[in-house]
Every structure is written in C-alpha cells, then in structure tokens.
Amino acid sequence: MNAGILGVGKYVPERILTNFDLEKMMETSDEWIRTRTGIEERRIARDDEYTHDLAYEAAKVAIENAGLTPNDIDLFIVATVTQEATFPSVANIIQDRLGAKNAAGMDVEAACAGFTFGVVTAAQFIKTGAYKNIVVVGADKLSKITNWDDRATAVLFGDGAGAIVMGPVSDDHGLLSFDLGSDGSGGKYLNLDENKKIYMNGREVFRFAVRQMGEASLRVLERAGLEKEDLDLLIPHQANIRIMEASRERLNLPEEKLMKTVHKYGNTSSSSIALALVDAVEEGRIKDNDNVLLVGFGGGLTWGALIIRWGK
C-alpha cells in the first residue's frame, strides 16, 4: 500500500489585480513585471475573507471530488503562513466548519515549500495505516502581509488555496520519493520584518531557489529509480518564471512539461504548488500512470521535492 491523491479542489478570490492596476498604485509597469517575473495578474481576497475561508472552500471541493464526505476524513493538514491567530489552527477551523467530527487537524509551516511538507507528512500516516483519508491544504492570504510600498515585492504576491485528499493506493502508484530540507542560516534573506510585512533579499533567494530546487529534483528522481525523461509533468513553486525555467532546464525537459500558473495567480506561497496541481488536473495535463514532480522553496530557508505517480 502507498499514499496517493484521490481528489483535488481549489479556491481563488474573485478580485483580480492586474499589472496595469499596480501601475496606478506605484512606480512600475506591466512590461517590467512581466519580463522579470512572468506575472500578469493576481487574486486578492476581500478584507473580510480570511485564510481559513480560502482553505475551507478548497477542502470542500477536494472532498467532493474524491467521492467522500467530511465524516470520512481522518486528518486535516494545512500549510500556511497567514493564520489569523497562533491558535486555533486553520486546520481546526475548517474541520469544524465542514463538520468533520472524526478528524484531527494541524497546521504546518514551511512557507512556500509548505504544501510539499504537508503531502509528505500525510503520506506517512497513510502508509503506516494510522489514518486512511487525509486532506492537505495549501492556503495563504499574502495580501495582508505584503508591503505595498515596496515595489520589488508588492508585484509578486497573491491569495488563494489548493487542496487534495490523500488516501491508500497501490504500491506502484502514489508518492514514490521525496526530499525535504532546511537551511536556517538563510532565514535573514526572506522573513517578516518588524512591521509584519514580507522582506526579501531577491538576489540571495534566487540563488538558493535555483540551486536547491535543481538538486532536490535530481535526488528524488534517483530515489524513485527514474530518469529525467520519465517525468511527465514538472510543477514547481510559482514564484518567478526565471526560477521555474531554470528548474525545467536543469532537468532537460521540454517546455510543454512545465506547468505554469504564475501569470494568473502570482506567488501564493503555501498554496502555489497546490493551485498549479489542481489546474493541471482540471486542464487534463495529468493522466493515469504519469510521473509528476512537485518542487518548491520557501522562507526558512526551506525546500521540498516529491514525485507522485498518478492513479490508484
């Protein structure tokens, strides 16, 4: 028995903030943003719309798509950096709102790599037989911690949530390998400043991301006994098109094997990889027996990579 994906779901706020909107808010341009990041627009949550609202909507859809009910869920794991409070956790809030009376809940925090940490954590519970059905959510409302006076970072971030239901699958499907890591010495390069807004040293973060995402991708391939050409789809953290393209080139993959959503969502941190995965499923980019590589990096500094073989 292995742990695989049974259903997916997403939620993005209605409001779209385009690069042209940002031109009216700060000294920037659509051309400057697109050429450096690949971002054209991002979603922004309402003031009265919170991270747990985004997570709830995505989880609800994922459970329905898995053909399950909330009472079938044993555990909720939410990856986020924008909890409204230290406690209760976002996972506990959505567990209550969904009426999932049989489920436990906990949040995990590894910034933009958080979803990969959540997936790997869920897989361990399933593979040991401790739990059967686990909802893993990546959700963030980055607009509330964005410094809108810093054009270098304000143009990057958006809000949203992606969710999956994980459960038992056959031994030759599901999670084939993973690589999680941290380099705490780099925490000074990406963090919340004294005003609780995002600070980023873009140059240092770029170097870290390109190096670690590439190396982690090669490690999970080796651990899964796969070659680069065995990969059917690469879903990287949607931070910056240049970082994403560097990851693709490191693996010698053709352009069509790179999943891109950065243009329409921007960088949504914990939900970035999850949203891209859900879009890939909805667009028919993933079919049974496909080998899918998820890889990301985040504040901490952290990184996570994993390979899933699609299907049951």
Curated annotation (Swiss-Prot):
Q: Which GO terms describe its molecular function?
A: 3-oxoacyl-[acyl-carrier-protein] synthase activity; beta-ketoacyl-acyl-carrier-protein synthase III activity
InterPro entries xrefs: ACP_syn_III_C, ACP_syn_III_N, FabH, Thiolase-like
Q: According to its UniProt record, which residues of this chain constitute the active site?
A: C112, H237, N267
What this chain does, per the entry, is described as: Catalyzes the condensation reaction of fatty acid synthesis by the addition to an acyl acceptor of two carbons from malonyl-ACP. Catalyzes the first condensation reaction which initiates fatty acid synthesis and may therefore play a role in governing the total rate of fatty acid production. Possesses both acetoacetyl-ACP synthase and acetyl transacylase activities. Its substrate specificity determines the biosynthesis of branched-chain and/or straight-chain of fatty acids.
Q: Which family does it belong to?
A: Belongs to the thiolase-like superfamily. FabH family.
Subunit-structure text: Homodimer.
Q: Can you say what this protein is called?
A: Beta-ketoacyl-[acyl-carrier-protein] synthase III
Species of the source: Listeria welshimeri serovar 6b (strain ATCC 35897 / DSM 20650 / CCUG 15529 / CIP 8149 / NCTC 11857 / SLCC 5334 / V8)
